[in-house]
């Protein structure tokens, strides 16, 4: 039990990825034919959508942004589908199942970044950018260096996320469906490539929307059945859970998963600013027609996600009552069959029988596909748009850029499958924490200051951004998660599991210092360009909308 909790708590936003949701010990389950049939129905339906989307992808705008014609409501659902992962569902429910109230604190932690995105980023990002957040960061700064840094930040985050997601997918499918791990990884990789290769952002968007609807429906039904069991009384829910849980009343006490205030603060900052620096999330704001729709996207997405995380809290307590106290779901040693992360899946069986169990298992797989499709598209756009079309071959035609993007999708897919197989038995939970730390320490400071600080220069952004990225990586390696748990050293050089507090500080200080001391003519010119950028970011004047976007 302690190992499962440690692995879950040792990642910055463990629920941002399927990998860490199943980082504890898992046991392969018997082949679940109902789940497989339901999943095949989902795959056939989404491949049909991909075929439909492929007929409508005629240009670079269509491929990267679905023509800019996604509505705020649709994009809000898609963002929720991109952000709510299998770990959000299984991992958070498992945390509530084992630790009670602390699970709610973690689930709410994933929402704290969205007000930042709503009030500080969404509108200006849409008004200044076209396809990637590097468009915004390089708006008035030197194109080459800034795009290289932004693309590197994006690709590192995408790669770490993708590896962890593929390993998580293989283990999760082995656990839920009884399929072989290698078959599961190849299946996810091939489907991911097909969605992105042929359907681009339009297919990816609708896969994410469908997945979000299915996940919200499944979680709502489970929460409804749990509340029905206790007469729709939260008092009864908590009382019954405390009565059967081994920890008793202690499950209602907070503070059991974070050791000290610095770790808590660092974790919170990583969650908050990491979310605002995830390339596959930021890319979604270019799929809407204008800044107003971008704001609506965040509003709807936050509502859907907030509702979902409240449901996971109810599901977790429901699992304590209906699963934890039921010997049918325990093995001979008294442990939950399949591990604690199966709590929500067992609850699906308890409240809806085998048919609903199959549905929830299929939804968990669909969840993984939606997330990896978004990641792959973000990685491909960083290579084709930021590096190829704007650094290495300026003036490349749309056709050339799209060809590079699709080649990148194939390469990313093959690499993801190979690394997913190679990392099968490795502890990859730290990759999620590192991805969020880099997003918070490199991507976020550059995006924020490029839009809001008139004195930012290319020198400051480059040196500060690289310092933030390197600091996050080094501190993560020297911390307890990698240095002790993975490399086997006796004591960590850096005592905290979460580096975000320190790496973010280094990034902001570095950007400020090297920009403030930049007295070059180029730096002065970049400062003068801020006023024109500010006007466009506020008014949207000059922004192309809709299909022309």
Curated annotation (Swiss-Prot):
One of its GO terms (cellular component) is plasma membrane. Keywords: Cell inner membrane, Cell membrane, Ion transport, Membrane, Sodium, Sodium transport, Symport, Transmembrane, Transmembrane helix, Transport. The keyword Transmembrane helix applies. It comes from the Bacteria. The keyword Cell membrane applies. InterPro entries: Cation/Ac_symporter_ActP, Na/Glc_symporter_sf, Na/solute_symporter, Na/solute_symporter_CS, Sodium:Solute_Symporter. PROSITE patterns: NA_SOLUT_SYMP_1, NA_SOLUT_SYMP_2, NA_SOLUT_SYMP_3. GO terms for biological process: plasma membrane acetate transport; sodium ion transport. GO terms for molecular function: acetate transmembrane transporter activity; glycolate transmembrane transporter activity; symporter activity. CDD domains: SLC5sbd_u4. The chain crosses the membrane at residues 33-53, 77-97, 103-123, 148-168, 183-203, 206-226, 262-282, 303-323, 355-375, 404-424, 428-448, 464-484, 493-513. It is found in: Cell inner membrane. It is a multi-pass membrane protein. Transports acetate. Belongs to the sodium:solute symporter (SSF) (TC 2.A.21) family. This is Cation/acetate symporter ActP.
């Amino acid at each position: 039990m302690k190992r499962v909790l440690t692995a879950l708590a040792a990642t910055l936003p463990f629920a941002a990825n399927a990998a860490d949701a199943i980082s504890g010990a898992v046991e392969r389950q018997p082949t679940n034919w109902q789940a497989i049939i339901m999943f095949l129905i989902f795959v056939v339906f989404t491949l049909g959508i991909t075929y439909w989307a492929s007929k409508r992808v005629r240009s670079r705008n269509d491929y990267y942004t679905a023509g800019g014609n996604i509505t705020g409501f649709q994009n809000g659902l898609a963002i929720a589908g991109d952000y709510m992962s299998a770990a959000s569902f299984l991992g958070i429910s498992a945390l509530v199942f084992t630790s009670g109230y602390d699970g709610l604190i973690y689930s709410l932690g994933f929402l704290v970044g969205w007000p930042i995105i709503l009030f500080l980023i969404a509108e200006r990002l849409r008004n200044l950018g076209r396809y990637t957040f590097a468009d915004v960061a390089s708006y008035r700064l030197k194109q080459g260096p800034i795009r290289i840094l932004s693309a590197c930040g994006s690709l590192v985050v995408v790669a770490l996320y993708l590896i962890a997601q593929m390993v998580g997918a293989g283990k999760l499918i082995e656990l839920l469906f009884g399929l072989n791990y290698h078959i599961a990884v190849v299946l996810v990789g091939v489907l991911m490539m097909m969605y992105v290769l042929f359907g681009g952002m339009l297919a990816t968007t609708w896969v994410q929307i469908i997945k979000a609807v299915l996940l919200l429906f499944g979680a709502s039904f489970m929460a409804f059945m749990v509340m029905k069991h206790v007469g729709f009384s939260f008092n009864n829910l908590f009382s019954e859970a405390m009565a059967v849980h081994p920890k008793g009343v202690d499950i209602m006490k907070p503070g059991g998963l974070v050791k000290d205030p610095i770790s808590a603060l660092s974790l919170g900052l990583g969650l908050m600013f990491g979310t605002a620096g995830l390339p596959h999330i930021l890319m979604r704001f270019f799929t809407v027609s204008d800044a107003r729709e971008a704001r609506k996207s965040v509003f709807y997405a936050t509502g859907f996600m907030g509702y979902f995380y409240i449901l996971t809290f109810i599901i977790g307590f429901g699992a304590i009552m209906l699963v934890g106290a039921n010997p049918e779901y325990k093995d001979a040693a008294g442990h939950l069959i399949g591990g604690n992360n199966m709590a929500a899946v067992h609850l699906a069986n308890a409240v809806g029988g085998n048919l609903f169990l199959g549905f929830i298992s299929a939804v968990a797989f669909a969840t993984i596909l939606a997330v990896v499709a978004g990641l792959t598209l973000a990685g491909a756009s960083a290579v084709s748009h930021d590096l190829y079309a704007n650094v290495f071959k300026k003036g490349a035609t749309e056709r050339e850029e799209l060809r590079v993007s699709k080649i990148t999708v194939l390469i990313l897919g093959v690499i993801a499958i190979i690394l997913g197989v190679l990392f099968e038995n490795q502890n990859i939970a730290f990759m999620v924490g590192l991805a969020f730390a880099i997003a918070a320490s490199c991507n976020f400071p550059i995006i924020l200051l490029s839009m809001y600080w008139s004195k930012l220069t290319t020198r400051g952004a480059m040196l500060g951004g690289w310092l933030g990225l390197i600091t996050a990586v080094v501190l993560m390696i020297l911390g307890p998660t990698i240095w002790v748990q993975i490399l086997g050293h006796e004591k960590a050089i850096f005592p905290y599991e979460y580096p975000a507090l320190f790496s973010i500080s280094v990034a902001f200080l570095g950007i400020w210092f090297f920009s403030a001391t930049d007295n070059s003519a180029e730096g002065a010119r970049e400062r003068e360009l801020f006023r024109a950028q500010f006007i466009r970011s506020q008014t949207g004047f000059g922004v192309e909308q809709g299909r022309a976007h």
